[in-house]
Amino acid sequence: IVSEIKKDEEWLTVELNPTRDMLQSLAAKIYSMPQMNKIFVNAKLDFSAFGLGVSIENAAPVTDIENVLELMLENIKKHNKRLLISVDEVTNCEFVKVFVSSFQIFLRQDYPIFLLMTGLFENIYDLQNDKALTFLYRAPKIMLEPLSFTAVRKHYMDIFELDQREADKMAALTKGYPFAFQVLGYLYWENRDDHTIEDILPEYDQC
């Protein structure tokens, strides 16, 4: 989706890491876009308090990160652009909750901002059940079916030349998640010569 939208000059796209300060990261990434940086400089917007650019003479520095983003979004709207933010492997952590709370404010102010989040069902469920983030209940959701156990087992049998018993064990570990299927396959491929499936489980569990 993001790759297709990037082809449209009216769209700006930003990918955020949910384990970092997402508001700060969003501001930094928007500011680093050449077309937007020029607009902010010409508008004499001073974001130096957040390490974005330099102090501007006769301009009061903006000292609140939400205000920084509101000014950025105002200029994005003014220049007929739209902003898509994507977040992969989202969890119900403090950074995500703060970001989504601010995102609700930006929506109410009618800024052209859009959010695409992906993650495990249980993580999305926990997040939308937060009383401060009720708008997520109304947000469109696409539920992806888990990968077929039989198909995963066959892939592992064909690629690694495993017997059905070993392939069954690996397929069960993925629980049908595409990411888990890829990670487990990668770890087994890298360690197959001198490690068993049980040997790689501690590293797999950390992913």
Question: Residue ranges of each PLM-predicted region?
Answer:
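P-loop NTPase Walker A phosphate-binding motif
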Residues: 1-12
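A short helix-turn-beta junction within AAA+ P-loop NTPase domains corresponding to the substrate/partner-engaging
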Residues: 11, 129-146
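A short hydrophobic beta-strand->loop->alpha-helix junction that borders the nucleotide-binding pocket
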Residues: 13-22
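Switch/connector loops and helix/strand junctions flanking conserved nucleotide-binding motifs
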Residues: 22-26, 123-128
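Conserved Walker-type P-loop NTP-binding/catalytic site
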Residues: 30-72
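Conserved Walker B catalytic segment
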Residues: 58-122, 129-132
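Conserved small helical "lid"/interfacial subdomain of P-loop NTPases
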Residues: 139-167, 173, 184
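Amphipathic alpha-helical "lid/sensor" segments that cap RecA-like P-loop NTPase cores
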Residues: 161-207
